[in-house]
Amino acid sequence: MKHLWFFLLLVAAPRWVLSQVQLQESGPGLVKPSETLSLTCTVSGGSISSYYWSWIRQPPGKGLEWIGYIYYSGSTNYNPSLKSRVTISVDTSKNQFSLKLSSVTAADTAVYYCAR
């Protein structure tokens, strides 16, 4: 079965914007078609509380696409075009938030970013 590659990057916002806050993604580098992509973003240098946390992606040769965001309290908002396949969750005890994208296809191949 053909594999899809998903590239993970460290996303560190400029210090003058987020002070010492850094975001580190983790997850598998590849997912098979029809499977679920699961990524986790760990927030360090600050608390996950009181902010909105987002997932975005950039397909090869294309612009950025917003996937969705979650507030530290757990409320979410998703891109309507992905809503049926996306779940974003937060774990304040671990200072982490996560993305699950189900039923992946070749169209989901992209660089995935977490951001505040």
From Swiss-Prot:
Residues 53-69 are annotated as: Framework-2. GO terms for biological process: immune response; immunoglobulin mediated immune response. Residues 20-44 are annotated as: Framework-1. Residues 77-114 are annotated as: Framework-3. Residues 20-116 form the Ig-like domain. Disulfide bonds join 41-114. GO terms for molecular function: antigen binding. This is Immunoglobulin heavy variable 4-59. The gene is IGHV4-59.
